[in-house]
Each structure stands twice: as structure tokens, then as C-alpha cells.
Amino acid sequence: MIIGNGGIAKSFESSKLDHKLLCIIAAGHSDSTVNDAHSFRREVNMIKRVHKNHTNSKTIYFSTTSKYLSATQTAYIKHKISMETLIASCSTRYTIINLPNVICSLNKNNQLIPWLYHSLQSGKQIDINPEARRYIVSSDEIPLCVEKIANKDYKQVALMPQTALKMYELIEIMEKITSKKFNVNYSNFTEYYQKIFEPKQYDFVYEVNGSRKNIERILTKLIRTYE
């Protein structure tokens, strides 16, 4: 069973994954800027309801690698950690899959890639630390990760690229694809997302290709389809 209708949930539509014995919760918050107690409570209630109605299924929940990579514990990160605790208290049959920045769609929201794309299209000035790093994966990798770990007893899994891209590289990639220039102010302001990924913090790491060439390929396909 798949719960949700967003980008992550839709990534399972073309997947061959047999999820009849799984309860894949893909309906949580993906906007790391959110700080809404009401919507946080709604997710708590949803998870409790799911566990009550699907006691025989293994739960797959998507959290964030930012809980270890971020130097600042935002409301969003604290909420994700509390959701992990809730799931662990409801069942012993679960896996938390921690995600970095996910390329799902270009629909307007506060996620990194859509924010960059629409800032580029509008000419809005953005402030960027060029040396800041971002770990980026495609949503197409998520069903493959779930298939890999579905029958394992891992509690904490990370879906991570082998390398991180610097922000100036992302800027260059999107400018190349669109033949447009960002209105960007490069500055060395303090970045809250500077820590290096540590595999030992997880039971299993599902590694994907995060090279500049591969991210350019994924973004080219996404942008061409959107436009």
C-alpha cells in the first residue's frame, strides 16, 4: 500500500515493486521550511491511523538526512525525528529511509530544485554560498531502494549519492540547460548544511550516482518535459 499522491508516491507508479505487504508512507512533509504545528499534528494523526489499520504490514517512512547534516535543528527536522520515534513506538516492523534533496518535479514549492528553476525563470535575485554542498538524488531511485531493503531488518537507511554538488555547480548546470543566467549574489554567509555525510550513522546506505554529469542528465530530462 502506498499512502500519498506527491512526487515520491508517484515514483512508485511505474515501479515493479510488489508492495502488497508494505505500508509506504509518502504523504509527509517534504518542505524543510515548514513550521506549522497544525500540519505537523495532522501527520501524527495520519501515522497513528495507518498503524491502527495496517498492523500486518511493514512500514516504510521517509525522513531526512538533514538531521545529521544540518548544524541547526529546525522545526522541520525536529518534527521528522519525532515521527521516527512515533513509528518505532507503534511497530517493530519498519524502516526509516532518510533522503537528501530529491528531484521530483518543478512544481512551485520551497524545495531546492523547483526554487532554483523558478528563480531562474523569473529573474529573482537569490543569495548563494557557492561552496555550499547539496546531496541530490532522483525520485526514480526511491522505489529501487525500497525494493533492496524491503525484506531486511534495517531500521535506519540512507539513500545517498556518492558525492555532493556545490551550489555553483547546480547554478552552472541549470544555466546550461535553459540558456539563461541566474540573478545570483554569491556570498560566503554561514551555511547550515555543511557537514559531511557519515555512513556509520545508518544501518545501510543505498548509494546512487550523484555525479555532475548524471544530475545534469536528470535535470535536462525534467526541465525539457516541464517546458
Task: Give the predicted meaning of each segment.
Residues 134-137, 162-165, 210:
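Residue-level signal for the nucleotide or nucleotide-sugar donor/cofactor binding architecture
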Residues 145, 151-199, 216-227:
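Mid/C-terminal beta-alpha module of Rossmann-like enzyme folds, strongest
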Residues 25, 58-63, 95-98, 158-159:
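Structural signature of the Rossmann-like NAD(P)-dependent dehydrogenase/reductase core
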Residues 89-96, 100-134, 139-141:
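NAD(P)-dependent short-chain dehydrogenase/reductase
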Residues 1-5, 125-127, 157-160:
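Short hydrophobic beta-strand segments
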Residues 40-49, 64-104, 108:
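Catalytic helix-loop patch of NAD(P)-dependent Rossmann-fold dehydrogenases
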Residues 1-17:
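N-terminal Rossmann NAD(P)H-binding glycine-rich loop of SDR-like oxidoreductase domains
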Residues 14-56, 64-72:
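NAD(P)H-binding glycine-rich loop region in Rossmannoid oxidoreductase-like domains
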